[in-house]
Amino acid sequence: MTNDSARMRKVLTFTRRSNRMTACQKRDYQHLASRWIIPYQNTVFDYAAVFCSPAAPSAPAGAFPAPQGKTDAVAPACAPAPLVVEIGFGMGSATAAIAARNPHLSYLGIEVYRAGIGRLLRKIEAERLHNLRIIEHDALDVLRTMIAPQTLAGLHIFFPDPWPKTRHHKRRLLYRPRTDLLARALAPGGYLYAVTDWAEYARRAQEELARTPSLTWAPQGARPWRPATEFERKAQTQGRAIHELFFIKA
């Protein structure tokens, strides 16, 4: 490990926000965490075994009635589906929408904000999203220890903290050598899709990603399959432009 890499491991890329939750979010977290959250571990986890197995029931009977046309049947037997990771899903609305539209893919959302986790847990349970799981931990630790190199079909990083002050730029997620770790996790042909409303961050992130070995910029604008996030709608209401960055692993 280089000295720069060692220093980076000690710097958090996220703000420690309050874990205050509503009563509903607390209930959902208490009842559903064991069903849909994968505990953090210091070894590579077998994602195929997780996603190809049924989630053990843990919610009170009748608390989350199945939506029309869906049942609480076990997840079907399956071959390992391509795995897509989202770092920092916020309140999880876009995450759930993407997973619902792509049942042939496996999705893993990584977040430390417990209120958002509670809300996404409810969406997963209510919509029976067997192809979506959560890890509650620092995403960089997860990528270092739980995700084997060249595993991921995609990485979603939607509206990461821009850390606008110059002295805080070293905390940015899209900053080398952190981007090297992101690229390492991607399988050949996998993609990294980042979105921000901070123009200076978009420019610098594009430069950092372009300098990252094995990543190639694929500029095509917004992907039509990405739903708008709550943060994005707020940014657009305030007149801020949205910047899309899409890179492919060679």
UniProtKB/Swiss-Prot annotation:
Its EC number is 2.1.1.33. Substrate binds at K165, D197, T229, E230, F231, E232. The active site is at D161. InterPro entries: SAM-dependent_MTases_sf (IPR029063), tRNA_(Gua-N-7)_MeTrfase_Trmb (IPR003358), tRNA_methyltr_TrmB_bact (IPR055361). SUPFAM superfamilies: S-adenosyl-L-methionine-dependent methyltransferases. It catalyses: guanosine(46) in tRNA + S-adenosyl-L-methionine = N(7)-methylguanosine(46) in tRNA + S-adenosyl-L-homocysteine. S-adenosyl-L-methionine binds at E86, E111, D138, D161. CDD domains: AdoMet_MTases. It holds the Pfam family Methyltransf_4. Belongs to the class I-like SAM-binding methyltransferase superfamily. TrmB family. Catalyzes the formation of N(7)-methylguanine at position 46 (m7G46) in tRNA. NCBIfam families: tRNA (guanosine(46)-N7)-methyltransferase TrmB. This is tRNA (guanine-N(7)-)-methyltransferase.
